[in-house]
Amino acid sequence: SIAMINELAKVLDTTSTYLIGYEHDEKNIRSLSDIMDFLFKLDRVTGLNFRIDVKRPPHYDEWECSITFNGKDKSADFNADMCLFLEEFAEYREQYRNGGMRSQRYKELQDKDLAYYSATEVEEKPLD
């Protein structure tokens, strides 16, 4: 189980993702286009639906854009997982930003989440 892997990682002073063989590249974002490319790829994931909301002047005072996942969308198998992840991420991200969490703990929580979801495979929708 993932809980056992997390405990083993603590005992062995390593990460859960290392133990399960999951590798992630921390230097792959080099430009804003890399982030935009990720959004294009995200849009092609089967089982994941999201809405993009845009609020801008003159109809709104601020210019805001957001990506929304509906966790109750039955046609999107991974939306509930995204909502659970984002809910937890928002909490520990806020704690970290406000100085209530050390960077080591922040990295441990990231590693735990990546290890947990690493076995959940997704497929891309074919381009027409």
Could you describe each region identified by the protein language model?
Residues 2-5:
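Long, hydrophobic alpha-helical segments
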Residues 10, 14-104, 111-128:
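Charged, helix-prone or intrinsically disordered regulatory segments positioned adjacent to compact structured domains
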